[in-house]
Amino acid sequence: MQQPEAANSLNAIELAVLDAPVLTRGALSMFLLHLADAGAFDPVWSDQIHVEWTRDLQRLRPEIPAERLRQRRAELERAFPVANVIASRDAQDEVLAHCTTQAERKSAHVLATALSARASVIVSDTSFCLAEVMSKVWHDIAVLSPDDWCMELLDRQQASVLAGCQAHRAAWAGGDRSIDAWIAWLRAPHAGLTRTADQLDSFRDQL
């Protein structure tokens, strides 16, 4: 039988930094934030992460007005008012001390934000280049893809994930609101949650 402390640690709400490549993908990030709103995890970001995702989205989608991007950031801040973290000088110095390339120094703020927030996870994509730096910084922080993070959450916070999925599906703007269409949407490139979609397919009666 599990001791209460062990059970509580398994079900504790984790903090996860959402990196700019994740926030740039609006469909994906909105799905993740529905899970967060349902209590599956607490999101973390920083002013610099906001600057990066808005800049990247302007480059990828120049037709989107700058005012719309400002509104999106304001909506994120209103929905999660304690998510924005200012990286401490000590954390920044610790990370930068182990950076040897310009790419590492450019991304150092993401790890410094995670350290300052005491986050357990950084959710990013394959562009994240601090694996070697992280091996030298003695902190237990995982770097996961959005799909891997959702799979972890399904294992640890199943009820909250399913509640978040229900809320996302209810708010989903897709024309066909069937469960099959929604799961196909998760698998499609704009979300890219193929393993998560496969796993959620077994919970379709709860979605």
Language-model-detected regions and their locations in the chain:
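Metal-dependent nucleic-acid phosphoesterase active-site entry motif
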Residues: 1-30
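PIN/NYN-family metal-dependent endoribonuclease catalytic core
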Residues: 15, 26-63
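Acidic, metal-coordinating catalytic cores used for nucleic-acid/nucleotide bond scission
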Residues: 22, 92-106, 127-131
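Amphipathic coiled-coil/heptad-repeat helices and related helical stalk/stem segments
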Residues: 28, 106-107
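Glycine/small-residue-rich phosphate/adenosyl-binding loop
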Residues: 67-77
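Acidic catalytic patch
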Residues: 76-100
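Acidic, metal-binding active-site segment of PIN/NYN-like and related structure-specific nucleases
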Residues: 107-142
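Acidic, PIN/NYN-like endoribonuclease modules and their adjacent C-terminal/linker elements
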Residues: 128-207
